[in-house]
């Protein structure tokens, strides 16, 4: 069960999220068992479509606080985010693929953020950038949402207060890896209309042994 299937619930009474998630296997394996030729063709189509999607991620020009300054710094010539096909900032959510929540999400701003997200066309992804967007950060008060995942489905979390532009670029590469393993509907008529996502281990778990093995910490001059 290395994949999760997310289906939209049209009759759900909840405002958001109107979806259910369950563990499953890669649907390509089922296609291969039924018909090897059609299974390989379907796998190739998903590979081509995912390649195009992951190399053409247009972010929505949207910022809430100081993390937005670090985000736009990644678009300068020093970092050159154009290498990843993500340099085209869009002023309209209808033309964007990725929404980066960069900053502090206030309670009054939450309905606006959610409405902008709903205006984005599928496929769409969300990156939570910074401690405030991840968990409220230092603002454990009534006016700040304690994490945007309370009302939005977050794909990638970026720790830091604020995170550096390199962290944003790293998040883009992780999102590209996630998109490369996705299985989305290729037609609104044929096949399952849910979204299959591969379960990816968090960077914290993957790098745990590496961090534990560090005994001699480098000095500030070597960093």
Curated annotation (Swiss-Prot):
Q: Which InterPro entries match?
A: NADH_UbQ_OxRdtase-like_20kDa, NADH_UQ_OxRdtase_20Kd_su
Q: What is this enzyme's class at the first EC digit? A: translocase
Q: How does it sit in the membrane?
A: Peripheral membrane protein
Region called Disordered, residue ranges: 1-21
Print the keywords alphabetically. Answer: 4Fe-4S, Cell membrane, Iron, Iron-sulfur, Membrane, Metal-binding, NAD, Quinone, Translocase, Transport, Ubiquinone
Q: What is its EC number?
A: 7.1.1.-
Q: Name one Pfam family in it.
A: Oxidored_q6
Give the binding site residues for [4Fe-4S] cluster. 66-67, 132, 161
Question: Which top-rank group of organisms is this from?
Answer: Bacteria
Q: Name one GO biological process term.
A: electron transport coupled proton transport
What chemistry does it catalyse, as a reaction equation?
Answer: a quinone + NADH + 5 H(+)(in) = a quinol + NAD(+) + 4 H(+)(out)
What is written in the cofactor note of this entry?
Binds 1 [4Fe-4S] cluster.
- Paired cysteines (S-S): none
Question: Any idea where this protein resides?
Answer: Cell membrane
Cellular component terms (Gene Ontology)? plasma membrane; respiratory chain complex I
An MF annotation (GO) of this entry: NADH dehydrogenase (ubiquinone) activity
> Main location per UniProt?
membrane
Which cofactor does this sequence's record say it needs? [4Fe-4S] cluster
Q: What does this protein do?
A: NDH-1 shuttles electrons from NADH, via FMN and iron-sulfur (Fe-S) centers, to quinones in the respiratory chain. Couples the redox reaction to proton translocation (for every two electrons transferred, four hydrogen ions are translocated across the cytoplasmic membrane), and thus conserves the redox energy in a proton gradient.
- Spell out the family assignment given in the record's similarity comment: Belongs to the complex I 20 kDa subunit family.
Report quaternary structure and partners.
NDH-1 is composed of 13 different subunits. Subunits NuoB, CD, E, F, and G constitute the peripheral sector of the complex.
HAMAP family the record matches: NDH1_NuoB
- Put simply, this protein is called NADH-quinone oxidoreductase subunit B
Per the UniProt record, the source organism is: Buchnera aphidicola subsp. Schizaphis graminum (strain Sg)
């Amino acid at each position: 069960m290395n994949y999760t299937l997310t289906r939209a619930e049209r009759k759900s009474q909840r405002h958001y999220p109107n979806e259910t998630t369950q563990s499953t296997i890669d649907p390509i394996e089922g296609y291969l068992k039924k018909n090897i030729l059609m299974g390989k063709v379907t796998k190739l189509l998903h590979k081509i479509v995912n390649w195009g999607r992951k190399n053409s991620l247009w972010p929505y020009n949207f910022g809430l606080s100081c993390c937005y300054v670090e985000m736009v710094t990644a678009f300068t010539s020093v970092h050159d985010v154009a290498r990843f096909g993500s340099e085209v900032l869009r002023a309209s959510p209808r033309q964007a693929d990725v929404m980066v929540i960069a900053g502090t999400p206030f309670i009054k701003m939450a309905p606006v953020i959610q409405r902008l997200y709903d205006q984005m066309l599928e496929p769409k992804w969300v990156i939570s950038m910074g401690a405030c967007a991840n968990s409220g950060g230092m603002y454990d008060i009534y006016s700040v949402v304690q994490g945007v995942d309370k009302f939005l489905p977050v794909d990638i979390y970026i720790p830091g207060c604020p995170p550096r532009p390199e962290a944003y670029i790293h998040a883009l590469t992780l999102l590209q890896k996630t998109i490369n393993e996705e299985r989305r509907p290729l037609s609104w008529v044929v096949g399952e209309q849910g979204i299959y996502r591969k379960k990816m281990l968090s960077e914290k778990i993957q790098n745990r042994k590496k961090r534990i093995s560090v005994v001699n910490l480098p000095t500030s001059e070597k960093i």
